[in-house]
């Protein structure tokens, strides 16, 4: 309808303005910084030096133009259909050395932290779901271009696998799928040094690829050591294999920082003012912990914008966000218009299908998909509900537009945020798998990959404390008592 046309025009205008701003900025960066570096790299090479230089400069120019535009637009749950620039809503996050380090001095990241990275060169940023790891990486990437700190490359680690190593992924990004960029030229550039590699989302690598990707990172860093490497992940055991990286954590938001974030979400408007006043009233101290996490602050804004009530439990946050997305007029149009759902599912049936999809993604250990992969997962979910009449293509369309729990990234599709998938999976375990509930929870608890399930189990504890205690707390305490009796009461642990 007319609203969609208006939205598309506004979106197009925003994108056009962004492109007009980015093009000269990137051209200056390439001309004044990148090309002289490349000229230095190629001056010792016999043959078609000039041609290589032009080709390389052009490829990097196109890559930076595309990447700068892409990472400048924030993809967050708070702005379902509104274009927002990352720099406009970014609240500076702070890094501190990981827990086992005595130096607790926080380093505020409002730009690329040159001093920090000159000192450590290889930095690992680990933190739990929703602390803003990817946002932090994008902010630093943009600043490297703004202030000419080096030649940056942004690698999403979930794209790396046995048939697509780091070097190949960069050459594909620079040359396009049909015309890969010359890897020899790249290797020469990387060996020269002064490049900055942003490796984002180690925890999003499918488990069957973890070992390959870990080795690939180590090998890559060893072969081209005179560069800067920044890697992000949720805490995972396999990270021990990257011992030559200095680990940092993201500091929790202070209350004033979370209020600042809320104000930025509606440009100092009435919703944030009302919400902040309620939070300051002292009646909601039980959710103070939620205010420490940028993702939960975002969810709080979305939930409150929709219903003007403050959810007191994490899973109710997510449910209220889902409700807000489903009745999307509250978030984007400001009137009674609701997006048409091509699947024709009502909110309860849509929720039921999403729970199954969330669990299926958990079972397959996937959060990013090709179109065929995602349609296959929807087919699997649909087969479990023969009484529901919808096509997989219709639901996919809804998941990208009407109820955008997924977003498209080039030829790939992914959850808007991994924690949404974990919420639906946790709900599925509680509501839809009564006969297997104990077995599923026990399997998660006994998994070698329990680190990967911490956020899901945290959500599950909120939803079903009794089931959590029975299947996780009780076995943990029993194992502890057994260990204690065998090692201490028997005296075997005594000298």
Protein language model features and the residues they cover:
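P-loop NTPase signaling cores
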Residues: 3, 7, 12-81, 85-87, ...
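Alpha-helical repeat scaffolds in large eukaryotic proteins
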Residues: 26, 30, 207, 358, ...
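P-loop NTPase catalytic cores that bind/hydrolyze ATP
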Residues: 133, 288-325, 347-365, 418-427, ...
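Short, mixed-charge aromatic SLiMs
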Residues: 160-161, 165, 196, 317-331, ...
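Extended amphipathic alpha-helical scaffold segments
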Residues: 428, 432-495
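Short linear capping/connector segments at secondary-structure termini
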Residues: 277-281, 335-340, 441-443
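Extended helical regulatory/linker subdomains that flank P-loop NTPase cores
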Residues: 79-87, 97-105, 122, 273, ...
